[in-house]
Amino acid sequence: MVKILKTGLWLRLFAAMGLIGGLSNIATAEDWAEDQWGTLSGRELDIAAGLELTWGIKIMSFGALLMILTQLTRASTRARIGASLIVIFVVSEGVTVSTLSGRGYGEDASLPVAPLLIAGLLALLALASCIVHWNDPTDA
């Protein structure tokens, strides 16, 4: 089991997903805004698209940070930083969605099931690999 839970691999995959997902969100911010907020026009659409653009930048920034820290760290340090960043990211995304949902975000929208399942699975595998390697001896 430990052989498939290689911390570096799963953290890099999760970071790459963040980079690609964030870039996708940035590129299609206006489409996301229309899908999640319903019929908007003019300034409302600009504000909603700006929110989606900012969200994409946040996701991309997380992916870049995780990728860089994965490259710069080893052993238990990598596992501990990786686990911390995954938990922080998942909690912040949950808080963001729940806060916006109370304001009408996503009420009539289609839920992107496949990307959410893939992201959830990658997050779980990356977190599990970090937990398994939490106390690995440091490299000399």
Roles of regions detected by a PLM:
Residues 1-21, 134-136:
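Cytosolic juxtamembrane helix and N-cap/initiation of the first transmembrane helix
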Residues 16-56:
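Hydrophobic transmembrane helix segments
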Residues 20, 46-71, 88-91:
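Core segments of alpha-helical transmembrane spans in multipass integral membrane proteins
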Residues 50-59, 112-122:
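Alpha-helical transmembrane segments of polytopic membrane proteins
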Residues 69-87:
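Loop-to-transmembrane helix junctions at the membrane interface
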Residues 81-98, 118-125:
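Hydrophobic alpha-helical membrane segments
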Residues 121-140:
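Membrane-water interface at the C-terminal end of transmembrane alpha helices
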